[in-house]
Amino acid sequence: MFTGIINSIGNIESRNIDEIQISTDNDLYHGLDSGTSISVDGTCLTLRDYNDDFLNFQVSEETFSRTVAKEYEKDVKTNLELPATLTTFLSGHIVQGHVDNTSVVTNIVENDNNLWTYHFKNTDTRYIVDKGSVTINGISLTVVNPDKE
C-alpha cells in the first residue's frame, strides 16, 4: 500500500508490449530487491529486477488497458512512491494502487490553490464524495464539489 505522497520522479527509458523500464536519480530506488512493490503514477507495479540504474517491470495487458501506462513513451516523467511501512506517516490517504480507470483534465483554474477539474470516464461515481480522497497519477487529492454528471 502507498500514501499518495510522491517521493521521486522517474523517467521512462523504454516501453514494449509487456515491459516498462524506468530510471530515477533517487538513491532510495537503487538496488531494490525483485518483488518490491512500487507505485508508478499510482499503479502498483512489482519490480522484476534492478540493473544498470534501471527499474524493470513486467506489465500485463490488463494494466496497460486500465492505466496511463498505455501512453508511456521514452522520456515521459512518472511519479514514483515506495510502499508504506508501519512507521510511514500517512500524510495522504491509503492507496492500494489497483487502478480501475483513467480520467481526463477538463479545466484548470490557476490561482493560489490551482483547481483542476477531471472527468472520469465509465466510472461508478457514487464512491467519489465531497472531501473524500482520490488518487490521480499517484498523488493523493481531496475531492471538492463532485459533480455526478
Model segments located where?
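Conserved loop->alpha-helix
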Residues: M1-E149
